[in-house]
Amino acid sequence: MMDNKDYKKFYLIREDVLPESVVKTLKIKDALKSDPTLSIYDAVKQFDLSRSAFYKYRETIFPVDDKMLDHREFTLILYVTDIVGMLARVLDVISKLELSVLTIHQSIPMEEKATITLSLNAKSKETSVEDVIGALRNLDYVSKVELISMSM
C-alpha cells in the first residue's frame, strides 16, 4: 500500500491561470521535444526563464494531449419533477448534443421528485460540459443539474 506522503494529487487547470514560469516551462519542454539539437541552456534563454525555475517544474507539469480530450467522459445528476416523458426529454437533449450515453439510472420517484444520473461521452470538441449542463438546466421540470465526475 502506498504511503500517504508518497501520494500526489493531480489537477487539470486552464493555462491562463497558471503562473508565467509554469507556462514557459511547458513551452520549453515542447521546444526541446521538437528540436533535439536545442540545449536546455539555449531554450531557457529563448523563453526568458531561469534554469532553476525550469528544473523546478519540468518533471511536475504535463500538457493534456488533444487525444485525451477526444474522449471526455463525465457524469451528471439531474434533479427533476416526476412527469411522464421526463427521461425522454432529457435523452432528446443528449441526442441533439451528439453525446453518447454510457450509463443511465433513474431513481424511484418520491413526493413527485426523482433523480436521473447520466454518464456521458462527449467526442465532439464543440460541445463543452458547460453547454450540456446549460441545455439540461433549461429543460422544464429540471430543478438542478450537478457535475459529479469527469475524466479525460
Swiss-Prot record:
Domain ACT: 75-150
InterPro entries listed in its UniProt record: ACT-like_dom_sf, ACT_dom, UPF0735_ACT_dom-cont
SUPFAM superfamilies: ACT-like
Family as reported in the entry's similarity comment: Belongs to the UPF0735 family.
The protein's name: UPF0735 ACT domain-containing protein SaurJH9_1700
Organism of origin: Staphylococcus aureus (strain JH9)
